[in-house]
């Protein structure tokens, strides 16, 4: 029992808290009124966006490159080979006569000429060796393209591993492929299909190089387009296209690890000359431009700017052909670039330049 006396029951009233009406919290509705001068923004279509028909016409200009297979000796090879042998004999006889004549005058002159001739011969042999190595490297890239395409088509795992190992060897000296090669090494044992291995190697190793190659082709095309638009003579256009195309092919070859020598570069020159022939015919006038790139686009550009766009497109086509030649793997997992990828940038570039004038 507790010593405290329990409290007697008493009655008390609980105070109710003030209720806030939900209706009072709402703001007074705005009275309806008419809004005048309502600004409307209508999106405008880009005038340089290609329609499906124009894109199809441009893709016709850009067929996939197929390296022709030449077997045996052609008449041109026999001719230049025979002329090369005759020139070599002539240089040898002239050098021998010169050294004999110098020995007849003074012994030290003869020995000096003989030493210089030996140095020149050693340098010539080194150049020939370097060119042969470059040609062999170029031929190995061509064979690797065929082997990779064949392995992907037949889904041959052994052939795919061999092709990927060759690709690793080519890309070993390219810093941009280090991350892709590391990832490929970690995933190679987990892949059981040859086609998937080829696609993975193309994606991880060649994708960064493809991205850089697209940038090189686009920048070269822009430079050609600008020079064509401002040059007063067609001869200047052709000369600059030759210079820019030559530099573009060499830079793409170095990018993909091909590094062709002088003799290897001559093989590319035939395709460049063919493209330049097309470029020269395009410079005739706006009617040919309309036939090539569509009436819609040509009507939006002046004649000179249109020639700049088309010359830029031909440079882009040369760059795409060079990518087909020097790329170790054919385009399978990655999308092959086309002329339509560059037309918008070239047209906008010339349009902006025309607007600033």
Curated annotation (Swiss-Prot):
Entry annotated with the keyword RNA-binding: no
* Cellular compartments per GO CC: plasma membrane
Q: Where does the protein principally reside?
A: membrane
Comp. bias regions, Basic and acidic residues: 27-36
Matching Pfam families, A to Z?
Answer: DUF697
Keywords from the UniProt entry: Cell inner membrane, Cell membrane, Membrane, Transmembrane, Transmembrane helix
TM segment ranges: 78-98, 109-129
Q: What's the superkingdom here?
A: Bacteria
Topology class, membrane: Multi-pass membrane protein
**What does the UniProt entry say about where the protein is found?**
Cell inner membrane
Q: Where is this region: Disordered?
A: 1-36
NCBIfam families in UniProt? hyp_HI0043
PANTHER family the UniProt entry points to: UPF0283 MEMBRANE PROTEIN YCJF
For this chain, the family text in UniProt reads:
Belongs to the UPF0283 family.
Name by which UniProt lists this protein: UPF0283 membrane protein BAbS19_I09770
Question: What species was this sequence derived from?
Answer: Brucella abortus (strain S19)
From the broadest rank down, the organism's phylogenetic lineage runs: Bacteria, Pseudomonadati, Pseudomonadota, Alphaproteobacteria, Hyphomicrobiales
